[in-house]
């Protein structure tokens, strides 16, 4: 393969992952992890990235854009949101869901 082709191939293989950051953490409610399969959405720069919790209430979403965004948790028919920042490196955000007057709210742990 020609040197120019090798450079182009290397750029294509390594450029996308270098710009992506991981957002991960846990979601709890009432002091316990939420069940597996709770939908988690992260919106940054107009793009929406989705994931879901595992049996430990943990979630992990790869977000390509950097900057201010919103995390939304879809739980028991309600969808509270909380602001976050996406970086080019892994960032942890742990959240607590709380029910107040039949309204679900979310806050950082």
What are the functions of these language-model segments?
Residues 1-7:
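Bacterial N-terminal signal peptides that target proteins for export
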Residues 12-22, 100-109:
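Beta-strand-rich domain onsets/edges
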Residues 20-21, 45-47:
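Short, small/polar residue-rich loop motifs at catalytic or cofactor-binding pockets
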Residues 24-35:
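Structural motif
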Residues 85-109:
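Extracellular beta-sheet/turn segments enriched in Thr/Pro/Gly and aliphatic residues
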């Amino acid at each position: 393969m020609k040197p120019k082709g090798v450079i182009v191939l290397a750029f294509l293989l390594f450029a996308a992952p270098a710009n992506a950051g991981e957002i991960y953490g846990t979601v709890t409610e009432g002091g316990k992890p939420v069940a597996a399969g709770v939908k988690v959405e992260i919106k940054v720069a107009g793009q929406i990235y989705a994931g879901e919790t595992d049996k430990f209430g943990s979630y992990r979403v790869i977000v390509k854009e950097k900057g201010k965004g919103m995390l939304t948790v879809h739980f028991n028919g309600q969808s509270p949101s909380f602001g976050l920042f996406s970086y080019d490196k892994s960032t942890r955000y742990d959240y607590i869901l709380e029910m107040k007057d039949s309204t679900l709210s979310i806050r950082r742990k």
